[in-house]
UniProtKB/Swiss-Prot annotation:
Residues 215-245 have a biased composition (Polar residues). This is Mitochondrial distribution and morphology protein 12. It comes from Aspergillus fumigatus (strain ATCC MYA-4609 / CBS 101355 / FGSC A1100 / Af293). Keywords: Endoplasmic reticulum, Lipid transport, Lipid-binding, Membrane, Mitochondrion, Mitochondrion outer membrane, Transport. It is found in: Mitochondrion outer membrane; Endoplasmic reticulum membrane. The gene is mdm12.
Length: 439
């Protein structure tokens, strides 16, 4: 099934201009996180335009949305979860002690007595929700100071969450949710139904423990969001969770006997909260071909080392005038959210088959006999390489001699910028990363 896209209507007007500005700002922010080579001082992104040539879309399949699209953000639902737990605790208290819910008793209790604890003394609590003992090293839960966030951000929720996290554009962080008692990721196993409400309320009322300030900004280059954001698991990134847990290299973690016992005896982290599947949820797989005139304007400042290192910087203007793209897009509609991403070559071959198989199926619709190719030809028809097959670019700096730039590093700058554009696209828009639009 092929569909026509009103490209001009979708990319023009106030909404189209706002979307183009958001894309420009996003690419610009990503370039600020890239470790630049010695001969480039900075890269600025000035403009983005969708162009006038629309892509070619061919619908391949309607199916159920990927499970990753149903994951909820812990920071968005922390307040809801706490309210639900509070209501559950209140209803349990009222059901077990109905005589204490009378108005006369409540007034007498409020005036003359303190509120009794519904659980007997000595009731065992979960060791994981109790205050940290002296046997745990305080460096086990570091809290690095972060500008703009009082007290810093705790990395506990980030390292203890499941392998499925947030991607690229999800661009919102869920790691900061680890600072509250309900998003710590500890399991409630071993706790009774009554003790769960008590321990959570007790943990929420505790005063924060003093923790040492550890400076983690000792990296020589700015990390990209691929190294700071947890990614969704897929067939090609099953080890992403292991890599994430090893990114916080603090030398203060001691492998003592008490620490090992605490880790080994603790339960595994809870799985991510999942939204409920509904019959109206659907997902579309589309084969996208694009050879258009999308434009991206950048400026890279080149450093000149003569007569001394980093003597002066010259701006090099780079204009991306078009790209050639061939890949499989995924569009999922879940409630009032639209999730969008592309599939890698391996995932696309696994879901909809290699390109040669698609060509045979499309040719078979004409009821013409097709010759069966050999296995070597079939292997050569598999998708390979990146999704961006070609990026056309024009550079402007100073004068030219015989159609060539005078400066020697212009070619290096062009290759570096184009490689970063390709990397940003593949890291932020290729599954398991995806973008979410609220409609």
């Amino acid at each position: 099934m092929s569909i026509d896209v009103n490209w001009r209507f979708a990319t023009s007007g106030p909404d189209g201009e706002a979307l183009a500005e958001r894309i420009r700002s996003f690419i610009h922010d990503r370039f600020q996180q890239v470790a630049l080579p010695r001969f480039i001082r900075s890269v600025q992104v000035h403009a983005f335009d969708f162009g006038t040539i629309p892509p070619e879309l061919e619908i391949k399949d309607f199916c159920e949305p990927f499970a990753d699209f149903y994951e909820e953000d812990d920071d968005d639902h922390t307040s809801d979860a706490s309210e639900e737990r509070g209501e559950e605790h209140s209803s349990r208290w009222n059901s077990t002690h109905p005589e204490l819910n009378e108005p006369s008793y409540r007034e007498d209790t409020a005036v003359n007595h303190s509120l009794r604890d519904p659980f007997p003394d000595g009731f065992p609590t979960s060791p994981l929700r109790s205050p940290l003992g002296e046997h745990l090293n305080p460096h086990f839960l570091p809290r690095a100071s972060t500008p703009g966030i009082p007290g810093g951000t705790s990395t506990l929720g980030y390292h203890l969450m499941s392998l499925g996290g947030l991607s690229g554009t999800q661009t919102p962080l869920a790691a900061v949710a680890g600072g509250n008692p309900f998003a710590s990721g500890w399991s409630d196993s071993g706790m009774g139904p009554g003790n769960r409400g008590r321990s959570e309320t007790h943990a929420g009322m505790q005063h924060p423990r003093a923790e040492p300030e550890i400076d983690t900004s000792n990296s020589t280059s700015r990390p990209s969001t691929a190294n700071t954001l947890p990614s969704h698991p897929s067939g090609s990134s099953k080890n992403s969770g292991q890599a994430a847990t090893g990114r916080n290299d603090h030398p203060s973690l001691h492998a003592g006997e008490h620490l090992e016992d605490s880790v080994t005896q603790g339960q595994l982290p809870l799985p991510p909260r999942m939204r409920e599947r509904r019959p109206e949820d659907f997902q579309v797989l589309c084969h996208v071909k694009y050879a258009g005139d999308v434009r991206l304007s950048l400026t890279a400042e080149i450093l000149l080392d003569y007569p001394m290192p980093s003597f002066v910087g010259l701006p090099l203007k780079l204009n991306v005038t078009g790209i050639t793209f061939d890949g499989v897009a995924v569009i999922a509609y879940i409630r009032k959210r639209v999730h969008f991403c592309f599939l890698s070559a391996e995932d696309a071959d696994a879901l909809i088959g290699p390109e040669q198989q698609q060509q045979r199926e499309s040719a078979g619709d004409d009821h013409r006999p097709q010759s069966r190719p050999d296995s070597s030809a079939s292997a050569s028809q598999k998708r390979h390489g990146g999704l961006l097959q070609e990026i056309r670019v024009e550079s402007e700096i100073g004068r030219k001699e015989d159609g060539k730039q005078v400066l020697k590093n212009v070619g290096k700058v062009e290759r570096f910028v184009l490689a970063q554009v390709r990397r940003i696209f593949e890291e932020e828009l290729v599954y398991p990363s995806f973008w979410t639009f609220l409609i």
